[in-house]
């Protein structure tokens, strides 16, 4: 079998890997095999948590809206508030409603009075 001279290709690949793993702790930033494993693990976690972040923010928005609704005493439940929004065809998503609830509660109060039956 003939010898294959690869030159700088393997070194270039490892330096790219080292740049990616430079912030990892211990052997995960020093040893090539553990660097590759840790890189795969990091990318898997990043992919998983991109979806999780969307769910977490939706939960946060719902919690904020629910807290302000209970504080105002307009409706006794969050889901009834959202249901009445859809019935009146007001196109406000949960993110915008949460921002209104935080920054301008009187505006949310007027919205809730508009959609009351």
UniProtKB/Swiss-Prot annotation:
Annotated keywords: Chloroplast, Plastid, Ribonucleoprotein, Ribosomal protein, RNA-binding, rRNA-binding
Gene Ontology MF terms in the entry: rRNA binding; structural constituent of ribosome
CDD domains, per the entry: Ribosomal_L20
Superkingdom of origin organism: Eukaryota
Keyword match Plastid: yes
Role: Binds directly to 23S ribosomal RNA and is necessary for the in vitro assembly process of the 50S ribosomal subunit. It is not involved in the protein synthesizing functions of that subunit.
Entry-linked HAMAP family: Ribosomal_bL20
Protein name, entry field: Large ribosomal subunit protein bL20c
Organism: Barbarea verna (Land cress)
Lineage, uppermost ranks: Eukaryota, Viridiplantae, Streptophyta, Embryophyta, Tracheophyta
Gene label: rpl20
């Amino acid at each position: 079998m003939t010898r294959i001279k690869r030159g700088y290709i393997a070194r270039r690949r490892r330096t790219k890997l080292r740049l990616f793993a430079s912030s990892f702790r211990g052997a995960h930033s020093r040893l090539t095999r553990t660097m590759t494993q840790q890189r795969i693990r990091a990318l898997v976690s990043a992919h998983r948590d991109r979806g999780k972040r969307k769910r977490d923010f939706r939960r946060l928005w719902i919690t904020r809206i629910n807290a302000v609704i209970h504080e105002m005493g307009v409706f006794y439940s969050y889901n009834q508030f959202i249901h009445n929004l859809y019935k009146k065809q007001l196109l406000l998503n949960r993110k915008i409603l949460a921002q209104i609830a935080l920054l301008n509660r009187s505006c949310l109060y007027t919205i809730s009075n508009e959609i009351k039956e």
